[in-house]
Amino acid sequence: MKYTSYILAFQLCIVLGSLGCYCQDPYVKEAENLKKYFNAGDPDVADNGTLFLDILRNWKEESDRKIMQSQIVSFYFKLFKSFKDDQRIQKSVETIKEDINVKFFNSNKKKRDDFEKLTNYSVTDLNVQRKAVHELIQVMAELSPAAKIGKRKRSQTFRGRRASQ
């Protein structure tokens, strides 16, 4: 009886192991296609270190990582945009973009559209420059953690007074 359970456990491991090969995320296959297309597997690609991986390893806190990830995702969207006319890799690019949509934007189309809108602004466009400078003070106020804490304390104080009356 003991040997039977070992044999069944072994068979289960083999079945689950073989299923792992077929249950890969779709982006992996498409990323491999892009690597072949761009000869990104060649040894010279590793010269001078990584672009993104070391940066991601340096940041452990979730909010810090999200900031870095947003810049990296922005880079990839710009990169993919430059490939839009190349039909040989279009399927791979679209599959990867869709997977980014699921993983990074939680399938939230509005969030993705706003993100793409931000990454598509041209810093050389005079109207964009003028609007950005016009909004700078408000944007800086939104970035300040002190402003957010002050707002929260005021609203909590107000609620406390109302409850005691």
From Swiss-Prot:
Keyword Chloroplast found: no
Cross-referenced SUPFAM superfamilies: 4-helical cytokines
GO BP terms in the entry: adaptive immune response; astrocyte activation; cell surface receptor signaling pathway via STAT; defense response to virus; extrinsic apoptotic signaling pathway; Fc-gamma receptor signaling pathway involved in phagocytosis; humoral immune response; macrophage activation involved in immune response
Residues recorded as bearing Pyrrolidone carboxylic acid in the entry: Q24
Tissue and organ distribution: Released primarily from activated T lymphocytes.
Domain of life, per lineage: Eukaryota
Carbohydrate attachment residues: N48, N120
A single Gene Ontology CC term: extracellular space
Keyword Ribonucleoprotein belongs to the record: no
A GO molecular-function descriptor: type II interferon receptor binding
Residues annotated as signal peptide: 1-23
Chief localization: secreted
Xref: Pfam families: IFN-gamma (PF00714)
Primary role: Type II interferon produced by immune cells such as T-cells and NK cells that plays crucial roles in antimicrobial, antiviral, and antitumor responses by activating effector immune cells and enhancing antigen presentation. Primarily signals through the JAK-STAT pathway after interaction with its receptor IFNGR1 to affect gene regulation. Upon IFNG binding, IFNGR1 intracellular domain opens out to allow association of downstream signaling components JAK2, JAK1 and STAT1, leading to STAT1 activation, nuclear translocation and transcription of IFNG-regulated genes.
Family: Belongs to the type II (or gamma) interferon family.
PANTHER family linked: INTERFERON GAMMA
Subunit structure comment from the entry: Homodimer. Interacts with IFNGR1 (via extracellular domain); this interaction promotes IFNGR1 dimerization.
The name this protein goes by in its record: Interferon gamma
The species this protein was found in: Cercocebus atys
